[in-house]
Amino acid sequence: MTLPATGGLPEGPPVRTRIGLIAPFDLALDDELARWIPDGVSLHAARTPRLPGPVDLNLVERLNDHDQILACIGELGAIEPAAYAYACTAASFVDGITGEHALAEAIRLAAGVPAVTTSGALLAALTALEVRTVAVAAPYDIVITERLVRFLAEAAITVTGYGSLGLTSRIWEVPYRTTAELIRRLPGTGAEAVLLACTNLSSYDLIAPLEAELGVPVVSANQATVWAALRLIGRRAVGPGQALVERT
């Protein structure tokens, strides 16, 4: 095989800044998370061990196992991520604000680089948008959903109303129509934004049209996770028509 002269070859391979994604065992939306990633950045995931049982409070509490979460850093460390994101909403809010801070700090100390959790990212996103009142839509059962409402209250975020789908498995299969209807029928008035929980609930293509319909930002768990992780490395997310991406 004859190769062209050196001058005819493209420069490469491309230089990319890597983000390490620590995911729960059942995360199925890696492809959606990647849609917010700009050129020059790549996302690399490691998963915590599989746990049997439905997605209920017991499983969520078991997911928040620092040893298992930090073991993922060992799996990803060889490629030297510039930042880490723990991509599970419920496991990062289940122990409240103190628990979220402790988890994020444990990841930062173990990795030696900046880190964020999904719940911390959601709070950062609401702060960036100057939002203090939200309506909450979640796929979980009511027990987990109310734990999220309590977490937000700890952060001085007022929840005007909330609704849940009551699901305990296969959340990634929820149709956009189902999520949109859940958001439209949320109780209460006066919310400055809608918060859409769970990194296994698909949202990318819903955000812009729902924001246009509702007239307020729609902040999803996946959107906020990638947005916050990119901010740690000085980059911006890709999300045409999405308030969080375009206003902050």
Question: Where are the regions a protein language model picked out?
Answer:
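Glycine/small-residue-rich loop that forms an oxyanion/phosphate-binding "nest" at active or ligand-binding sites
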Residues: 73-116
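Conserved beta-alpha
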Residues: 103, 107-166, 246-248
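Hydrophobic structural segments
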Residues: 4, 17, 41, 110, ...
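Periplasmic-binding protein-like
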Residues: 82-87, 135-136, 191-198
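Short, flexible loop segments at boundaries between secondary-structure elements
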Residues: 166-172, 214-238
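N-terminal glycine-rich anion-binding loop in soluble enzyme alpha/beta folds
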Residues: 2-71, 137-175
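Hydrophobic alpha-helical
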Residues: 186-210, 226
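Short, well-structured alpha-helical segments in soluble
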Residues: 65-79, 179-191
